[in-house]
Amino acid sequence: MPREYAPAHRKRKSHDISDDADAAAAPGAGAGPRKKILLPKKEHKYPSVNELKKRIRDVKRLLNKADLPADARIVQERALSGYEKELEDELKRRDRSKMIKKYHFVRFLDRKTATKDVNRLVRREKEVSSAGPDAMDTKTKEKKLASLAEKLRVARVNLNYTIYYPLDEKYIALYAEQKKKVKGDGAEDGGDGADSDGDARFGMVHATVADKPAMWHVVEKCMKDGTLDMLRDGKLESGAKAGEKDRKKEERSQRAGDKAKKSQERGVSSSQAGKSRDRSRKVDDRKRSRGPAEDHVMRDAGNDDGDESDGGFFEM
């Protein structure tokens, strides 16, 4: 009996399957390679320092050319001044940002403590002012109110100090050492950290106003003048900057005085050296003038001795 025709099953190759899948997934893939999508460059908010320095170098290199036209030189000089100003502003901005990050947490802690002090003193002042005549007499009440008013004024200056301290200068903390002192006092006094008035815990690190940092007094003055915002932004000349300028001025004047003194000493020494040279020249001239005369005299003396001896010989 003849066998039925049964063709052998042929297994498809893997590349055929992948080709069919690619063709089904991307019908237009055979047209060419896929185009790359270029993302737009991120625009920086502030100029690059390296780019500004490169522009300044290029402009200076161009200005060093002797054959540069006058109008082009004027344009390049203006561009150079603009680039230098931008570079200076960018460096100042970076230094300011660095100082803000460095002292941010310290300022936050001081501001928090100063705010608590102001709120407590305000509550204390309200309690004393609302107290009746049975609690305390009028004289004691007025005395306490005056003391609280002074403490409240100092506390408000402290709060403004923490808020409006110049952002581009090194921050000097007000409460860092005070917390340690309060802990130590509490351990010594057996946990009794308040006096009869209940305001001892609000004391500052510095015992008196005179002991406070120089910037504290600048903040107090700016509170009266209404220029706290300008002080914070560095638009006012603070005590530290003024002191730095005075110190640099003194150093410059001292260097100028030293140079003048050295030049004067050089002048005196040169004049003395000139005088000594003149004296030596005169002595040399005298020696030279005396030399031929002495030689002539010596020759004459020798001739006289010879004549006398010769005469004596011939006479004999």
From Swiss-Prot:
Keywords, sorted A to Z: Coiled coil, Nucleus, rRNA processing
Superkingdom in the source lineage: Eukaryota
Coiled coil: 48-98, 139-160
Example of a GO biological process term: maturation of SSU-rRNA from tricistronic rRNA transcript (SSU-rRNA, 5.8S rRNA, LSU-rRNA)
Pfam short name (any one): Efg1
Family per record: Belongs to the EFG1 family.
Name the UniProt record assigns to this protein: rRNA-processing protein efg1
Organism taxonomic ancestry: Eukaryota, Fungi, Dikarya, Ascomycota, Pezizomycotina
